[in-house]
Amino acid sequence: DALGRGNFYLCGHDRGGRVAHRLAVDHPGRVDRLCLIDIAPTLDMYNATDMRFATAYYHWFHLIQPNPLPETMIGGCAVAYLHAKLGGWGSRGLSYIEPEALIEYERCFCTPEAIHAACEDYRASAGIDLVHDRESRARGDKIACDTQVLWGERGVVQQLFQPLDLWQAQCAGIVSGQALPAGHFIPEELPLETAHALHTFFR
């Protein structure tokens, strides 16, 4: 409303995708089309936790530990931690990131405030967000609009989940999508391909 827009197309990657999912469920009349990048539904991911998932996404369980434990551990080696995350999850290192962009990532992430905010984000995901997701499912709430799902061929979503099936179960509209030849950071690894997929779906 503050932007003066009525209905809109919405796209989110990773945590942005989870926010987009919640927004589309809470305001079904406002989102005309939705694109979710490299996620399965949060509740399904937590419910399917096994050793493979916990190993690949250990940070989901590390970052939710009480403050200040994860903040202190990450803060002691913030650049190394950031590089490990950006270069992992099927991304095959940092070569896909321009040097100037990597410097900016480091500047933005490697502060106590940013690290704490990241941890709080994951704490919310394992806390109030799960409460809302469970309540929504109990009511039968679904995403009303057509939804596109994109995920990386080398990522955890591809390895451990069936994203189209999981999202179709949460959507009243049509779910389509595909795996792209990337790891987790699809927009950065494949910017042109991502833009093409979005343009095709949203036009």
List each language-model region with its residue ranges.
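Flexible "cap/lid" subdomain of the alpha/beta-hydrolase fold that forms the substrate-access gate
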Residues: D1-C11, R15-L180, P187, H199
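Catalytic histidine-centered segment of alpha/beta-hydrolase-like enzymes
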Residues: G183-A195
